Structures are given as C-alpha cells and as structure tokens.
C-alpha cells in the first residue's frame, strides 16, 4: 500500500512511456498473469512489512508472488519503506510484520482468518492464511539489484 499511497503507479501510468503491471487494475485470471509477468519486469516497486535496524527486510505473503519476485526475477527491486516499519531487531521486525501488517492485509483482502476478526496474530495455519510465506532479505548477491529508499515519515502499515 505504501507505493500506491504515494501515487507512484498513477504517476508512472500517466507518463505514458512505461508499461505498469498493477494487480489492482485487473480482475480474475488477469491477476495471476500480472504476478507471472512481474518476474520479467525491469523494475519491481514494493514496500516491506518491516526492516530491522541492521537492514534485514521482512515480508510475509499469502500467495508468495511478492516474496518470489523480491528473491528472483525482476532486474531491479526498489523498496520504499517508511520509518514506522523500522524495528530494532529482526525478531521485532517479524513481530511487527505478523502483528501489524498481516491483520490489516487480512482485513483489506477480506481473508477469513482469526486476525481479520480481532486484529491479533494467532499464528494460525488456516487454509486462507495470509502468512503462508515468511521472507528475510539480508543481502543481495547481485550488486545493486535491491535498493532501499527509507522515507523519513510513516508510510503504509
């Protein structure tokens, strides 16, 4: 939501010189096509659920498309991260991802999980769990592929 809240997809779309792959602009099977096409993108814009003070980026994903693209595929991955997502340790970053971002995402996507109901992570293993994939990015073997833009304000959740 950070990238969308900043209006970046609309800005890029209005330039008219780029193809913007945006799952929120399509429905049904076309969403899956966007997920697959993201692997061959020149640039993948995303945020993170959390980042530790020593730079470990933590993301939790329901389908795995985002963490897969972060790991492999697009030529460059740019993270735009607000200060509210910075945690002191990787353990605190994981706790933030599970306890803050996941319940909000479950509500956003209307996923029927315990956290969607009460906003508290129950570490559930429900078939609809939005926490199927937990991803830690601690370095990048491809120099320059991962770029972090840390914005000095609260962005996203």
Predicted features, each with a name:
Residues 1-46:
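N-terminal active-site beta-alpha-beta segment that forms phosphate/nucleotide-binding
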Residues 37-157:
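Conserved phosphate- and dinucleotide-binding cores of soluble alpha/beta proteins
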């Amino acid at each position: 939501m950070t990238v969308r809240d900043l209006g970046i997809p609309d800005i890029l779309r209005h330039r008219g010189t780029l193809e913007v792959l945006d799952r929120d602009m399509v429905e049904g099977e076309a969403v899956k096509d966007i997920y697959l096409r993201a692997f061959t993108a020149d640039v993948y814009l995303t945020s993170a659920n959390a980042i530790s003070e020593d730079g470990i980026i933590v993301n939790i994903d329901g389908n795995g498309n985002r963490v897969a693209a972060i790991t492999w595929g697009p030529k460059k991955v740019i993270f735009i991260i607000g200060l509210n997502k910075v945690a002191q340790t990787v353990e605190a970053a994981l706790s933030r991802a599970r306890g803050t971002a996941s319940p909000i995402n479950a509500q956003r996507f209307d996923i029927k999980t315990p956290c969607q109901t009460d906003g508290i992570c129950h570490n559930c293993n429900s078939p609809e769990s939005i926490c199927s994939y937990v991803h830690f990015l601690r370095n990048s073997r491809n120099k320059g592929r991962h770029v972090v833009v840390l914005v000095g304000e609260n962005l996203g959740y």
